[in-house]
Amino acid sequence: DAAAQAMSGSAPILPGATLGVLGGGQLGRMFVHEAQRMGYVTVVLEPDQSSPAGLVAHHHIRAAYDDEHALADMARLCAAVTTEFENVPAPTLQALSRSKPVSPAAEAVAIAQDRALEKAHFVRCGVPCAPHAVIETPDHLAAVQDDLLPGILKTARLGYDGKGQVRVATREALAQAWNELKQVPCVLEKMLPLAAECSVVVARGQDGQIVNLPVQRNLHREGILAVTEVHPGNVSEAVSYTHLTLPTTPYV
């Protein structure tokens, strides 16, 4: 029936319907602007009253991402819900998905917000990863192989724009860095002579059709993205690795 189609996401959500987005940042603002241009009503759930997306949405629910009353309002107002960044609690997406289509799914967001889970997911998918080790306990730290050094110690969660990352060359420096990071779960990645970092953005429809945008090359300064260039050259390898992850990554 129509309700089952809506929940499965197989029924089209036409302009005039209300779309919800969790998070009020710049990406959310871009989503809101484009949705409004297409004729949709927009709702943003974001605790910051002056957030970029909340300021331009039709409705701004100012509450925490795990506020039960706010989530009930989102479910009541919206035909479908998405998130504009990866650090929305996965249980929030899971709760909303019980009554409305949610994409990306909670399982995908849980992977994206944890570097250790992300590495394990890529390995299962057959995507080559830099040699690495997960460090969660002193025993894990002691078991790190010498051939992973020099490396970069990264917090498993919440690091961005160079934050939560420390370059280490020796075991002593590794131990000191883990202490400086408050001994939170971390991933140690071996430093490699990288030719470039690429981004592959793909979109998948409910019919399973997959389209990838032009591949981008990213240039960083001090661990922070500075320039992104679109390269039309030979990027088939990067695209193929991305497609390996899609069968087990619930994005639409």
PLM feature spans:
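A conserved helix-loop-beta module that forms one wall/lid of the active-site cleft
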Residues: 99, 105-166, 171
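Internal nucleotide-binding/catalytic subdomain
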Residues: 168-244
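ATP-binding N-terminal substructure of ATP-dependent carboxylate-amine bond-forming enzymes
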Residues: 1-113, 117, 139
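Structural detector of well-ordered beta-strand residues that form the stable sheet scaffold
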Residues: 43, 82, 102-103, 130, ...
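Single conserved hydrophobic/aromatic residue that forms the stacking wall/gate
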Residues: 243-252
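Short, basic and Ser/Thr-rich N-terminal targeting/leader segments
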Residues: 15, 128, 160-161, 194-198, ...
